[in-house]
């Protein structure tokens, strides 16, 4: 490779990183903690403050009296959801919740890719959860109830319930929501997010942390 070509090959990636750092600082934050143990040890009881299983096949869990998480439901799951008093469904999957057609549930579509979630996405979703809780029970879901749902559930724990990063990650990976190897994108975001900045943005009415 000629010297000029080598210089360009080196400079262009550095310039790109500089642009990303200015436009999306949340993407380049360094990790704060390592990966916690993904499962409970043998004989260890499930922590009382972890999400409570309602329907393991659907990966439906109650996180709080008016907040639930699951994989993608279908119309056959409607009686189960109605029995929990769910009023609002927040969908992170790319497809619309067609299974809700004809129901009286409020649906909010927030399509996300776990490897591209930003602080702005999190702030918007957490506000939607809070608003929905004022009306009744809220269900958050994606396709498998793991990566995207796990990320938002962990952020809810940290921002609104004061959990530590380690506590939120431990529940996400060890709570029975699926294989932790499929949650690496969520873990990456949770390891680098500035929780205090997200909380301050929500409290201050801002749409971003920048």
Q: Whereabouts are the PLM-identified features?
A:
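Cys-dependent protein tyrosine phosphatase-like superfamily
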Residues: 2-138, 151-210
């Amino acid at each position: 490779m000629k010297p000029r070509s080598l210089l360009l090959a080196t400079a262009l990636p550095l310039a790109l990183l500089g642009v990303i750092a200015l436009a999306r600082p949340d993407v380049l934050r360094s990790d704060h903690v390592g990966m916690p143990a993904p499962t409970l040890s043998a004989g260890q009881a499930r922590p009382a403050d972890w999400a409570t299983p309602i329907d393991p096949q659907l990966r439906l869990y109650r996180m709080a009296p008016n907040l639930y998480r699951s994989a993608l439901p279908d119309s056959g799951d409607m009686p189960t959801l109605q029995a929990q008093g769910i009023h609002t469904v927040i969908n992170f999957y790319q497809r619309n919740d067609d299974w809700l057609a004809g129901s009286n549930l409020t649906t909010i579509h927030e399509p996300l890719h776990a490897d591209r979630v930003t602080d702005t996405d999190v702030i918007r979703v957490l506000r939607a959860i809070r608003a929905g809780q004022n009306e009744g029970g809220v269900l958050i879901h994606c396709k498998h109830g793991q990566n995207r749902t796990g990320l938002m559930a962990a952020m809810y724990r940290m921002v609104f319930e004061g959990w530590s990063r380690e506590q939120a990650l431990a529940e996400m990976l060890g709570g029975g929501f699926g294989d932790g190897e499929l949650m690496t994108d969520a873990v990456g975001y949770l390891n680098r997010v500035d929780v205090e900045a997200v909380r301050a943005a929500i409290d201050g009415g801002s749409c971003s942390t920048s």
